[in-house]
Amino acid sequence: MKNKVFDIFSEICKVPRPSKHEEQISRWLQDFAVSHGIECVADEAMNVIMRVPATPGYEDHEGVILQAHMDMVCEKNGDVQHDFMRDPIETYIDGEWLKAKGTTLGGDDGIGISMALAAITDSDLPHPAIECLFTVDEETGLTGAMKLQDGMLRSKRLINLDSEDDGQIFIGCAGGIDTLAKMHYEPVSVSEAVCQRSGLCSVSPQGGLLAVKLRVSGLLGGHSGDDINKGRANANQLIVWFLARIWPQTDIQLASINGGNLRNAIAREAEAVLTVPMSYKEQIRIEWNHFVAQMEGVFGEVEKDMRLDLETCDMLDTFIPSDKAYRLVMALCECPHGMIAMSKEMPGLVETSTNLASIKMKEGYIEINTSQRSSIEASKHHLKWAVEQALSLACDEVTHGDGYPGWAPNPNSPLLEVVKKAYTDLFKAEPKVLAIHAGLECGLFLEKYPYLDMVSIGPQMYGVHSPQERLSIPSTERCYNWLCQTLKSL
């Protein structure tokens, strides 16, 4: 596969770049600029800005910013040994798709960087003055965009290269906010756990205890914005639904519960370890089999590789106190997840959603991460309060992140008209103009540079934020040609 964009992307895949750990990729970008004689500055946040002068004949044209983010979501399959802080991403070609071996690919947004770098190092491409803005930590906090200083950017037009849909131009995005909850507790021993009589169970332990592990795996997961309305299962929900189902039937002692990983990814895997009375041994398997059948009926058409496993396991030494464990399960059941409302203005666009992203056992507490999105600011805040109220049923600490603004669509954008015409001239078809239910950095750029005229484009990708991520090779080639045609036309 000989192509300048993919040659650059191949080099980027060798550089570790987890969110909040962009030191190596920031340095790589600066070295790239130096080696090509390109003006380059890096700010305190490690954002990198490259500046390329206009080519002959374009000196009096308004400049443009090409923008992408450095970091990538680091997800891997449970059976894959990969250290994202050290190991390169191993890629392979499957037909017309570029994929990674058991991990996220990092096409989001490594391919955006690659297209921008290919464009500014193409000596045959005529263009106005170009600024390349490469930001850090887009995936877990939009930190780079938030810390971008006033006055760093000179141009009034910006093309964001962080979209994932072929032949589509995005002119707006949702705002978002995170809700984080913690339930602190003092672990108890097996004997203490059994002696704690909460009054919430109907059957007493008899004949000893049976330790079992519940595990959900093989789910699609995906982006908590783009994929939230696709009917995919959330592994965290499946675990707590089953626990809530059997809790009234017997004495349960919950030893551990873990699921999900990143706030902007739908949970693909989750597990819980618990004990039940030995007398409940057969019944829990019956209940599990019924539950599996029900979940296959609900999600089977979408989740083709869903696995729900129950197995006996070794007894753990400590447990969550019974009353707290019960309240935790009920709070998680009450916590909303998924699509909440569709846009009335733009058919097919999710307006409001929330993601029950992760449940993590820490020393002395359980941490729950969620994220809320909406293109309507009031709806975003109403939803964060609903999540807070649900989690407060169990958690003694609930906090919210700073949040980030949405990007209001401007259908009369002059830049939009240029980008649309470039597409039509190349492909003899009309591109779709849409807004996206995901957080792009554009909303934050507008806060600092309210005069910016912006659009977002990108090649076709599926399964982003999951090990199923794949990037269309022909779509990438089309998108790069489209970008080049746009630069010629500006």
Identify the meaning behind each predicted range.
Residues N3-W97:
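Acidic/His- and Gly-rich active-site-bordering loop/insert found
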Residues Y58-F134, E138-T140, A145-K156, S322-A325, ...:
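Active-site metal-coordination/substrate-binding segment of hydrolases
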Residues R232-Q249, P277-K281, Y326-C333, A341, ...:
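His/Asp/Glu-rich mid-to-C-terminal helical/loop segments that flank catalytic regions of hydrolases
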Residues S10-K14, V273, R307-T318, A357, ...:
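A short beta-alpha structural unit
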Residues W241-I257, P409-L452:
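Active-site-adjacent substrate-binding region
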